[in-house]
Amino acid sequence: MCGRYAVTLAPEVFRQMFGYPEQPNFPPRYNIAPTQPIAIVRMKEGRREIALVRWGLLPSWVKDPKDFALVINARGESVLDKPAFRAAMKRRRCLILADGFYEWKAAGKGKQPHFIRRKDGAPFAFAGLWECWTGPNGEELETAAIVTTSANRDLAPIHERMPVVVPADAFALWLDPNVDEKTAASLIAPAQNDLFEAYPVSTAVNRVANDNAELVARFDGPPAPAPRQAAPKKAAAAPATRKPPKDDGQASLF
């Protein structure tokens, strides 16, 4: 699962790599989180364009967004078959700009965040799917999700999943809506080994409000502590004549 990532390099670096004509001047972002605006590159009228969409895919057929769970990742194994992804995989594939992402590794009773980036410091592209949802009053909401796959050898010790990284020489294939989805799906695979490096960073990244360069600095302190849990409240004694409530089945959810 990929739930946080970063876009920190100069806008011109991304423009040269992705080949879109617009010249956006976006600030560095060190802690991009679900529901926030994210930059994607897609095909429109035969050319590439950069666009801002919400991170969290919302299929066009959803009637009420409140009834649809937030989908930030699309498992590569199911994009050809799952109703939430099928249509986007056919016609609305995109590239998601990035130069690093975070994964959390179990460390004792806690989890230690790690920052993952290319060893050469270059930007890269997540494989993405985008959708446009239209509300009852004609309002439009464009959204996207990151396609994921099993982790490669280098990243598997941290997390079992990783984003699909599209090689630069395959950008055109992934973006072209005239390329059938099964051919495009051939790009859904773990990144080559020795491409990325990973190192521990501060747990400050856990807080979405934090967004600064210190988040990607190497952290050599002790392992992350376990999350603090509030002490359970002492239940009031029930009257002796009160019968215990019947099981309503909710325990099976946890």
Name these PLM-found stretches.
Residues 1-254:
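Short linear sequence motif anchored by a di-proline
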